[in-house]
């Protein structure tokens, strides 16, 4: 029995970060009812219905196929909303309102409902109507700048940093927090999760390190960049790679020793001074 046992969730089928949020809620014990399309989404990069390897986002969910442009099917969703604790949607801004499933309509049916919505840029603002993908959110927030080696173009990251780290996880945290509020007050809330905002939030560690003078604008010129030999990847004799991140002085000394170098070699003096500064901070 998970911590969300007894919580009922209605999820309007979408792409990537939104289904992942529903999956996490289901993993923690919530009953998730997925409202699927009666016909495949022509704009989806992956057909989750025919691609079994991609259907893991449906794990632990029940499902029903409805046409959200059909008033009778919209009413079916609203009936489910009346009996549920959470609704999740990842449509473009204004779409659920046009369908008759916006927050105001849903809260009229169920004032305690937690209405979770996911977009790339937020519901309002100059970029709200724009399309976007993970790399766009990671780029515009500045997070992509710190990946890669000096003089190289920024490295595209896996579709995790923005979509999942900046989108899915903030949405789930917002939903679970709002559930607690609804239980205590009887009032639901709207969780407006924007992947761009969540990605900026997740950069808090980087900005903190930069404020301490340990993160420079130049890629690979800091303690944590891929350009430093104590934080990098190396190809081994078998062709595979090993990752190394020996930031703290004790780990760095162990790395030097295991590599067969002399710890007291004069060539390490500057590095030892830099590590001593890091330790003092």
Predicted features along the sequence, with ranges:
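N-terminal helix-loop segment corresponding to the beta1-alpha1 unit
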Residues: 1-187
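Acidic, glycine-rich segments within the central catalytic cores of soluble metabolic enzymes
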Residues: 140-281
């Amino acid at each position: 029995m998970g911590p969300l046992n007894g919580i009922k969730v209605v999820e309007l089928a979408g792409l990537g970060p939104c289904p992942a949020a529903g999956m996490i809620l289901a993993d923690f014990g919530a009953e998730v009812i997925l409202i699927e399309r009666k016909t495949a989404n022509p704009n989806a990069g992956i057909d989750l219905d025919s691609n079994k390897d991609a259907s893991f986002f449906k794990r632990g969910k029940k499902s029903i196929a409805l046409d959200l442009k059909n008033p009778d099917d919209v009413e079916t969703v609203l009936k489910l909303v009346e009996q549920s604790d959470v609704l999740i949607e990842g449509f473009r801004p204004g779409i659920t309102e046009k369908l008759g499933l916006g927050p105001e309509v849903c809260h009229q049916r169920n004032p305690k409902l937690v209405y979770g919505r996911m977009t790339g840029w937020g519901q309002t603002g100059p970029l709200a109507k724009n399309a976007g993908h993970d790399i766009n959110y990671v780029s515009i927030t500045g997070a992509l700048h710190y990946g890669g080696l000096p003089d190289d173009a920024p490295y595209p990251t896996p579709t995790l940093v923005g979509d999942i780290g900046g989108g899915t996880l903030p949405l789930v945290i917002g939903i679970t927090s709002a559930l607690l509020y609804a239980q205590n007050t009887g009032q639901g809330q709207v969780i407006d999760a924007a992947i761009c905002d969540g990605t900026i939030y997740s950069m808090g560690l980087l900005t903190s390190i930069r404020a301490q003078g340990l993160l420079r604008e130049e890629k690979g010129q800091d303690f944590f960049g891929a350009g430093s030999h104590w934080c990098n990847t190396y190809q081994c004799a078998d062709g595979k790679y090993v990752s190394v991140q020996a930031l703290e002085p004790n780990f760095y000394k162990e790395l030097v020793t295991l590599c067969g170098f002399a710890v007291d070699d004069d060539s390490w003096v500057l590095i030892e001074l830099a590590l001593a500064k890091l330790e003092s901070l």
